[in-house]
């Protein structure tokens, strides 16, 4: 039986950049890795409040951390005169339990939140928690993404759908979705809906078209690094 590979990890270093960019010696690697996990979990909890689509962590040679937060609500994330951002950084320091660490948080505006797989998954999960139909929630997200320029969208919701005793999966797909073509610019994300009858899992794949030339791939990676 074939196993499905994560589309993001499948494309890291080819058409997508890694979510953590740093180098460390053996004795510091595990410490840095655990800090990265804490940072990702910290911003995961703020995803719905600030519409956070992705988090990228970078470290320099002095181990100073720069966190790039891609958000669709840039104004509310920064706050008046950057006050809210300062509070978020302070809470992040407390989470890491390391007051000496140098950490900066930079916010990047998401131009097309309708095409962001993470935000789509969270939108579907939010509607499921509001007891809306899982069919309507998925179809609405797919139609919205296709209207805004996606070439293909696939969604799956798994769990006790409509509260039935036996868990099952139901999904929809429209447009092209070449998951094993590395040139295909595919975003993948998951989300969890906590309902009264249990947890539902949401998976979303968004195809943004095929990258024809190597120069296009290099341009995407350079643009991501500049951001």
UniProtKB/Swiss-Prot annotation:
Write down the HAMAP family for this protein, in alphabetical order: Ribosomal_uS3_B
Q: Which gene encodes it?
A: rpsC
Return the CDD domains for the record.
KH-II_30S_S3
Q: Outline the subunit composition.
A: Part of the 30S ribosomal subunit. Forms a tight complex with proteins S10 and S14.
GO MF, one term, reads: structural constituent of ribosome
Q: Do you know which PANTHER family this protein is assigned to?
A: 30S/40S RIBOSOMAL PROTEIN S3, SMALL RIBOSOMAL SUBUNIT PROTEIN US3C
Chain ranges of the KH type-2 domain: 39-109
One GO cellular component assignment for this chain's record is: cytosolic small ribosomal subunit
Q: What does this protein do?
A: Binds the lower part of the 30S subunit head. Binds mRNA in the 70S ribosome, positioning it for translation.
Keyword annotations for this protein? Ribonucleoprotein, Ribosomal protein, RNA-binding, rRNA-binding
Give the species this sequence originates from: Mesomycoplasma hyopneumoniae (strain J / ATCC 25934 / NCTC 10110) (Mycoplasma hyopneumoniae)
Q: Which domain of life is it from?
A: Bacteria
Q: Which InterPro entries match?
A: KH_dom, KH_dom-like_a/b, KH_dom_type_2, KH_sf_prok-type, Ribosomal_S3_C_sf, Ribosomal_uS3_bac-typ, Ribosomal_uS3_C, Ribosomal_uS3_CS
Which family is this sequence assigned to?
Belongs to the universal ribosomal protein uS3 family.
Note the Pfam families from the entry: KH_2, Ribosomal_S3_C
What's a single GO BP term from this record? translation
Q: What is this protein called?
A: Small ribosomal subunit protein uS3
């Amino acid at each position: 039986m074939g196993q499905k590979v994560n589309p993001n990890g499948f494309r890291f270093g080819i058409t997508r950049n890694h979510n953590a960019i740093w180098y460390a010696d053996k004795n510091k690697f595990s410490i840095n890795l655990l800090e990265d996990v804490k940072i990702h979990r910290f911003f995961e909890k703020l995803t719905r409040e600030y519409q956070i689509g992705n988090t990228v962590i970078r470290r320099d040679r002095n181990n100073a951390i720069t966190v790039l937060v891609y958000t669709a609500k840039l104004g509310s994330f920064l706050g008046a005169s950057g006050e809210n951002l300062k509070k978020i950084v302070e809470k992040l320091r407390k989470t890491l339990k390391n007051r000496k660490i140098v950490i900066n948080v930079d916010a990047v505006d998401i131009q097309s939140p309708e095409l962001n797989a993470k935000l789509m998954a969270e939108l579907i999960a939010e509607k499921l928690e509001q007891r809306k139909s899982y069919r309507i929630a998925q179809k609405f997200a797919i139609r919205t993404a296709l209207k805004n320029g996606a070439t293909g969208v696939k969604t799956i919701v798994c769990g006790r759908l409509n509260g039935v005793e036996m868990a099952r999966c139901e999904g929809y797909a429209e447009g092209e979705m070449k998951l094993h073509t590395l040139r295909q610019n595919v975003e993948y994300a998951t989300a969890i809906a906590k309902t009264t009858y249990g947890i539902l899992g949401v998976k979303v794949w968004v195809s943004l078209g095929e990258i024809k030339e190597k120069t296009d791939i290099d341009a995407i990676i350079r643009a991501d690094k500049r951001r």
